[in-house]
Amino acid sequence: MSGRKETVLDLAKFVDKGVQVKLTGGRQVTGTLKGYDQLLNLVLDEAVEFVRDHDDPLKTTDQTRRLGLIVCRGTAVMLVSPTDGTEEIANPFVTAEAV
């Protein structure tokens, strides 16, 4: 076994492509992945943050904020997903009575 650390995720296929990143604390940003390291620190260009609802911080609004070039610290990254090729579906585990 070599002494070189490898990343948990292989993000090489997402470099120069759009990604969505969810961070601890509920922040959510999208942008073009420009780089990353073995600690999952991410560099995003043309980043846009989705502003959360003041009444319900778990929901995002249609309002966005342009951030430009940012670094997402790896310890704060909860989820990384491509923006292309994904679609939102209804939650099959939520019943009409629970809503």
UniProtKB/Swiss-Prot annotation:
Compartments (UniProt record): Cytoplasm; Nucleus
One GO molecular-function entry: RNA binding
Residue ranges constituting the Sm domain according to the UniProt record: 6-86
Database matches in InterPro entries: Lsm7, Lsm7/SmG-like, LSM_dom_sf, Sm, Sm_dom_euk/arc
Presence of keyword Ribosomal protein: no
Gene3D superfamilies per record: 2.30.30.100
PROSITE patterns, sorted: SM
Origin superkingdom: Eukaryota
Keywords, alphabetical: Cytoplasm, mRNA processing, mRNA splicing, Nucleus, Ribonucleoprotein, RNA-binding, Spliceosome
Keyword ATP-binding among record annotations: no
UniProt tissue specificity: Expressed in roots, leaves, stems, flowers and siliques.
GO cellular component, one term: Lsm2-8 complex
Quaternary state and interactors: Component of the heptameric LSM1-LSM7 complex that forms a seven-membered ring structure with a donut shape. The LSM subunits are arranged in the order LSM1, LSM2, LSM3, LSM6, LSM5, LSM7 and LSM4. Component of the heptameric LSM2-LSM8 complex that forms a seven-membered ring structure with a donut shape. The LSM subunits are arranged in the order LSM8, LSM2, LSM3, LSM6, LSM5, LSM7 and LSM4. LSM7 subunit interacts only with its two neighboring subunits, LSM5 and LSM4.
PANTHER family: SMALL NUCLEAR RIBONUCLEOPROTEIN, U6 SNRNA-ASSOCIATED SM-LIKE PROTEIN LSM7
Function: Component of LSM protein complexes, which are involved in RNA processing. Component of the cytoplasmic LSM1-LSM7 complex which is involved in mRNA degradation by promoting decapping and leading to accurate 5'-3' mRNA decay. The cytoplasmic LSM1-LSM7 complex regulates developmental gene expression by the decapping of specific development-related transcripts. Component of the nuclear LSM2-LSM8 complex which is involved splicing nuclear mRNAs.
The family this protein is said to belong to: Belongs to the snRNP Sm proteins family.
Protein name, per record: Sm-like protein LSM7
